[in-house]
Amino acid sequence: MVKSVEDVALMGIRQDMVQAIWEQAKPHLEKALEHSDGEFKIDDVLQFLLDRAMQLWVLYDISTHDVVMAGCTEIVVHPNKKICRVVLMGGLSMDLWQSQTPVFEDWAREQGCVQMETLARKGLARKLTELDYKQIYQVCRKEI
């Protein structure tokens, strides 16, 4: 049973291993999708992972090896910089995930990224400021 940040580890999943861990990661990603605006369906996420358009990350319980959180990143290439965007994140307490952000950041640097970003609801945006994230934009949408 996960009780603290010492009980978990974050691991990036190689594209050729996505199918092997998918059933453990899928429920956490589906939970994250419940809070989205319908940009993706779970089958879309799997296809993006298999196509290497996104990367799968899992937070697992060190003692049981159970997946307790899952998330996806994507590399966004702009003309003047490369950014690693956290697209989805779902599972247990955000505090557990926050403790592992250096793993994401180190990997992103290795890919040539100079920034991390995520689209976040207000509550998560407040928590991310504790990790030196700055709110840059407000996203507004209208159905047409």
Each language-model region and where it sits:
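Active-site rim helix/loop that mediates acceptor-substrate recognition in acyltransferases
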Residues: 35-56
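Short, flexible, glycine/charge-rich loop motifs used to bind or transfer phosphoryl groups or to couple energy/partner
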Residues: 46-47, 74-77, 106
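Short amphipathic alpha-helix that is part of the acyltransferase structural core
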Residues: 1-40
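Acyl-donor binding region in acyl/amide transferases
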Residues: 81-129
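Secondary-structure boundary/capping motif
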Residues: 3, 83, 132-133, 142
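Conserved donor-binding loop and adjoining core beta-sheet/short helix segment
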Residues: 51-94
